[in-house]
């Protein structure tokens, strides 16, 4: 999309939504709204609810900047609706969004494409309810998480056998499928991808030892180290496999790939976030800023990549 043509269009910043990450989405949306307004765009904030199609028609929206997190926002649902309404939108399309949101499906893709990812097993909620649990073959500790939630919602680190049942039940409150994943003992790192270009690698050091919902969104609870303290060879490899994961899932625009290293600093892809946070504490803007891209320019670049992904992205 050309800057001159989009300046005249009515742009919606779609935020809020119906997921458990609503609060974070509103923060992201407000930051994007401010950046685009300062750049001279005609922007309307739209809180996504069940009447979303009526709102888009009423406001005569011609382009959508997606600032949603979690279900119904980054899982392909909204993307499909915008495709039907022929409203160009930012970020990944229907299939890439759905695949990236489903941690189990995306890990199967990574495995097929030889992208390093921690070993894993899958449990069904029904198995837990009926106490039909097969024994896990992975050595402890393991990470237990719902297949389709973001912001570490429903995630537990299991150190002892007796913690496994409660952790599975907790994850089962959020999804019918549960992922049990090998725990990586190294560093937590993340790689932003902007238009097929990997951004600088960030190392995440939470004070609590676990980068949970509280650490993620509370100032001062986590230390971010840029560039990450890993060897140059591993650093470049982390960028390479992150870009490959982004491309394998068919992502477009912008995304953030989260990784863990083992004790030898080998990076493993955990998951791909097709709608990374864009708040003042968010990782992608930090990496972009380090690469010399100010926040307002980053937001504008994402907007200029807005398109319809079906029928050749017209």
Listing of model-derived features with the role each one plays in the protein:
Residues 70, 207, 273-287:
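Glycine-rich phosphate/pyrophosphate-binding beta-alpha loops
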Residues 1-101, 105, 124-132, 304-313:
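ATP-binding N-terminal substructure of ATP-dependent carboxylate-amine bond-forming enzymes
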């Amino acid at each position: 999309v050309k800057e001159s043509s989009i300046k005249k269009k009515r742009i919606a910043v779609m935020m809020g939504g119906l997921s458990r990450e609503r609060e974070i989405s509103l923060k992201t949306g407000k930051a994007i709204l401010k950046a685009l307004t300062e750049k001279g765009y005609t922007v309307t904030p739209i809180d996504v609810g069940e009447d979303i199609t009526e709102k888009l028609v009423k406001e005569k929206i011609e382009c959508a900047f997606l600032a949603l997190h979690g279900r119904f926002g980054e899982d392909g649902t909204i993307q499909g609706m915008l495709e039907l309404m022929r409203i160009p939108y930012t970020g990944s399309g229907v299939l890439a969004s759905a695949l990236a949101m489903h941690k189990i499906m995306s890990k199967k893709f990574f495995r097929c494409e030889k992208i390093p990812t921690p070993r894993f097993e899958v449990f069904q909620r029904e198995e837990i309810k009926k106490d039909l649990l097969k024994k896990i073959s992975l050595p402890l500790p393991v990470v237990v998480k719902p297949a389709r939630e973001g912001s570490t919602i429903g995630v537990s680190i299991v150190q002892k056998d007796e913690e496994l049942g409660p952790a599975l039940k907790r994850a089962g409150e959020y999804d019918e499928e549960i992922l049990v994943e090998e725990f990586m003992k190294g560093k937590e790192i993340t790689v932003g991808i902007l238009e097929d270009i990997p951004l600088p690698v960030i190392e995440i050091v939470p004070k609590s030892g676990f980068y949970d919902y509280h650490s993620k969104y509370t100032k001062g609870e986590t230390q971010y180290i840029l560039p990450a303290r890993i060897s140059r060879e591993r650093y470049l490899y982390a960028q390479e496999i992150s870009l490959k994961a982004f491309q394998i899932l068919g992502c477009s625009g912008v995304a953030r790939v989260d990784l863990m290293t083992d004790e030898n600093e080998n990076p493993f892809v955990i998951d791909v976030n097709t709608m990374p946070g864009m708040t003042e504490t968010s990782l992608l803007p930090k990496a972009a800023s380090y690469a010399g891209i100010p926040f307002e320019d980053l937001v504008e670049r994402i907007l200029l990549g807005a398109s319809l992904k079906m029928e050749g992205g017209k």
